[in-house]
Amino acid sequence: MDKLTFPIFPAADLVNFFRQNILTGTEAKNFNKNDLYPNPKPEMVQKLYMRILQQVFSYGVEQFYMVPMDLDIQYPHLVEGFAPVANILKLMARLLPMCRVYDFHPSDVLNPKGKRTLHLLSGIFNFLQFRTTQREVYMEYCSGYKSALENVRQLQKTNHEAEIKIEKLTTVPPEQQAEFKALSSEIHDLQQIISQEYRAKDVMFQEKIAQRKAEFAEKNKRLNEQKLTIATMKEEQERMKSQIVESPEQRKSKTERMKETVHRLKQARQETSDKCDHYRDRVALAFMWQSDVQGYLKKLQNIDANLEIHRKIHEEIRHIEEQLMNLNLELKSLSNEDAQLKRIILVKKEKLAKVDIKNKKKQEDFNQQKQEILEVCSHIQEKRQVIHGRVAQVLQEIQQTISKKEQLLETTEAGKNKCQEVITDFRAALEKYHDSLQKASERSADRRREKIAELNRRLSRQ
């Protein structure tokens, strides 16, 4: 007792635990601290051990009252009153080593002591707590395995749906493949032709505009020079008028010459203004051509926008493919985890199979003993009737649990039907979405054909 692997619990805690988890009905109500410590009652201790063994080893109450036939007793019916205690001693010798108690003696059941009883019950209490926690861990493990299987199924389903979407997005219908190829080649050719014509006309217009600007600058320079010469000549004329007295004939001839020069200057000015108007008309014509070129540019921009949409669709397809690859990786990892879980479950199943084989063997031996004992134990029929009443109560509880199970199955079936209806509605909505998408693609193809025809008409006019 000095080298314990579990704590010694007080009697009050042990009483509360066994009331809540082991004993039921009047047994739990009548069970108190004085039954265990300081002077334990053998009847209550034996009854408590019997209930613990029933829960741990799944023993029936009637099995404790059967005398084993392998004992060398001349009159086994004489020791039937000692049969429950003998079975308790045999099963306690199996149970207590699992509870880390290796010094069990029959006197612990026949003549229990206070501290010794607390020691044994503390070991059993520790084992039962460990058993319940491990059972919860195992149930969580089973639920996690089921959820992992559900995730694998969902990922496989999403993988399949993503593959179908990728096939629908990447594949062009066979009746539209030739038209799609022809339209793409025509669009490419039109882009090249329009870009070449635009570059050539743009270069030509830029050269003409630069040439006209140079001519305008030169004409303006000459006009300014002539204006400057006229102003200087007027100033000189005024200055000379004040200094020289000219004859009327000279003045007349000089004025005539000046009128001629003014007339020539007016003619030159008129010619320059006419040339300016002509150049202005040419520039306006160039601006008109520029508007047409801008229209072509807008059409090119629309084509680029369509190509950008096509590129985005390809990017979306690539993104879906990446998601599909990630889902495949997750599926592989989950399949590996599934394989590991299956291997662990197989090992546990093998262990359970071995235990089942042992239990079957023991059951066969027990059945054989039971057949031999039935002839001897007819006088304990009255005790069995009481036990049968309790068994009937247990069967009634089992029937109630079965009915609850059927109700749960009905609710799950209803939920399954609702899920099936949701899936059908989702499929119908998806088909409508695909139909609308197909109609939109047909409308875009019609618009593209109309734009190509309009471009061809404009090109043929030019």
Swiss-Prot record:
Residues 143-462 form a coiled coil. GO terms for cellular component: Ndc80 complex; nucleus. Residues 236-259 are annotated as: Disordered. It is found in: Nucleus; Chromosome, Centromere, Kinetochore. It comes from the Eukaryota. This is Kinetochore protein Nuf2-B. It comes from Xenopus laevis. Belongs to the NUF2 family. One of its GO terms (biological process) is meiotic chromosome segregation. GO terms for molecular function: protein-containing complex binding.
